[in-house]
């Protein structure tokens, strides 16, 4: 057990909002680059995550910063912390 009450830093991810049709929920596309094991070429991989947007402030095309939280529903484990860039 850890005697001091230090918490692990929260995991944060930046992504692009691709849908805001649900109430208090946005779908965020998170892209990352991985290196191919054999050829060494960098490949783009993407993941779609659902995030909690309590005030319904996000619009499609916004870039948001999310943090991991305890499960809010079956598919929501992320919460929108801030809107980094607004869509034009």
UniProtKB/Swiss-Prot annotation:
Keywords: Ribonucleoprotein, Ribosomal protein, RNA-binding, rRNA-binding
GO molecular function ontology, one term from the record: rRNA binding
Chain coiled-coil ranges: none
GO annotations of cellular component type: cytosolic small ribosomal subunit
GO BP annotations listed: translation
Domain of life (superkingdom): Bacteria
Residue ranges crossing the lipid bilayer per the database entry: none
NCBIfam families membership: PRK05610.1 (NF004123), uS17_bact (TIGR03635)
PANTHER family linked: 40S RIBOSOMAL PROTEIN S11 FAMILY MEMBER, SMALL RIBOSOMAL SUBUNIT PROTEIN US17M
Family: Belongs to the universal ribosomal protein uS17 family.
Oligomeric form and interacting partners: Part of the 30S ribosomal subunit.
HAMAP family assigned: Ribosomal_uS17_B
Known role: One of the primary rRNA binding proteins, it binds specifically to the 5'-end of 16S ribosomal RNA.
Name this polypeptide is given: Small ribosomal subunit protein uS17
């Amino acid at each position: 057990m850890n005697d001091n009450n230090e918490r692990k830093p929260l995991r944060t991810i930046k992504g692009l909002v691709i849908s805001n049709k649900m109430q208090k929920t946005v779908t965020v596309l998170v892209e990352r680059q991985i290196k191919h094991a054999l050829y060494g070429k960098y490949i783009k991989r993407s993941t779609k995550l659902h995030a909690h947007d309590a005030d319904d402030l996000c619009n499609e095309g916004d870039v948001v910063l999310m943090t991991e939280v305890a499960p809010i529903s079956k598919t929501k484990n992320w919460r929108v912390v801030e809107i980094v860039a607004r869509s034009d």
